[in-house]
């Protein structure tokens, strides 16, 4: 084995020279230079400074403007709530531990940080699944004049939390475990060991199949069908130009969210899968640290995409920030096409 396993940790560094110490008790400066830990802390500080205001503003603006409280926006707000969980439950912890060079909060703090990070990531993934299904049902119309209403949105939000908890909670109750990863300053699922005492192998397989592969299959299926439907509708001119443009803009926004999710999380998932399927292989702490910390940037991109691509929300946000006046002078009529709500279109 090229790493050192302890009772509740796995350090990707051989203890042949006797330098490895528990990441819960001692600085891990034998893994990297102190300045590298400081860089991680600076990165986490940046994510907090950007992540909290933009996600909080997303929630606040929606509460202030009734016109934004559409069913589809419930799912988008769910993403903002999940991001805030990551900011407060994970980022603040990782910032503090990076400044100290080890996970100072012990195994209990590791469980909390790992739980919030996993919960936030899974809520985001399952929210994208719900959005993909919504786009498929509304645009492809397999159920005729189906309209995505408030009850559907509430059920969708509840579904994302149930599925996310089904992934994030088991390690807290003895099925798998959360341990420090990479430079030992943040925590995640144990991909490093089989750990039969906690049935770790079965949990990791369950996680990759149920909470990553299946959601990806659903998302790609929905958007694959959607592309064909949009092409047919365009060729036959079955819907009004305004309706087509509105549906196209919403669909494009959600697709960009999916692409951004893949960019942030696929490197982490790929490295985790490699580590799990190559037990005992030789890899350094940076190998997992970079994708793990890069994945944390996911807390920023969803609200940024939403603000950039939804003109109505952008106008409402500027009005809120500027105390009731929009400096751009855009009226609501110009934003009608960009409203993030589903239209009820006659079936093909």
Curated annotation (Swiss-Prot):
Report the source organism: Macaca fascicularis (Crab-eating macaque)
What binding partners and quaternary form does the record give? Homodimer. May form a complex composed of RHO, GRK1 and RCVRN in a Ca(2+)-dependent manner; RCVRN prevents the interaction between GRK1 and RHO. Interacts with GRK1. Interacts (phosphorylated form) with SAG. Interacts with GNAT1. Interacts with GNAT3. SAG and G-proteins compete for a common binding site. Interacts with PRCD; the interaction promotes PRCD stability. Forms a complex with ASAP1 and ARF4. Forms a complex with ASAP1, RAB11A, Rabin8/RAB3IP, ARF4 and RAB11FIP3; the complex regulates Golgi-to-cilia rhodopsin/RHO transport in photoreceptors.
UniProt key word Glycosyltransferase: no
Q: Which residues are recorded as modified (Phosphothreonine)?
A: 336, 340, 342
- Positions bearing Phosphoserine: 334, 338, 343
Q: What is the lineage of its organism?
A: Eukaryota, Metazoa, Chordata, Craniata, Vertebrata
Q: Identify the residue ranges that face the Cytoplasmic compartment according to the record.
A: 62-73, 134-152, 225-252, 309-348
Organism superkingdom: Eukaryota
Q: Which PANTHER family match?
A: OPSIN
Q: Write out the topological domains of type Extracellular.
A: 1-36, 97-110, 174-202, 275-286
Q: Give the protein's biological function.
A: Photoreceptor required for image-forming vision at low light intensity. Required for photoreceptor cell viability after birth. Light-induced isomerization of 11-cis to all-trans retinal triggers a conformational change that activates signaling via G-proteins. Subsequent receptor phosphorylation mediates displacement of the bound G-protein alpha subunit by the arrestin SAG and terminates signaling.
The short sequence motif called 'Ionic lock' involved in activated form stabilization sits at 134-136
Residues annotated with N6-(retinylidene)lysine modification: 296
What name does UniProt use for this protein? Answer: Rhodopsin
Chief location of this protein within or outside the cell: membrane
| Alphabetical list of SUPFAM superfamilies matching this protein | Family A G protein-coupled receptor-like
Where is lipid attached as S-palmitoyl cysteine? 322-323
Enumerate the transmembrane spans. Answer: 37-61, 74-96, 111-133, 153-173, 203-224, 253-274, 287-308
Q: State the GO CC annotations.
A: membrane; photoreceptor disc membrane; photoreceptor inner segment membrane; photoreceptor outer segment membrane; plasma membrane
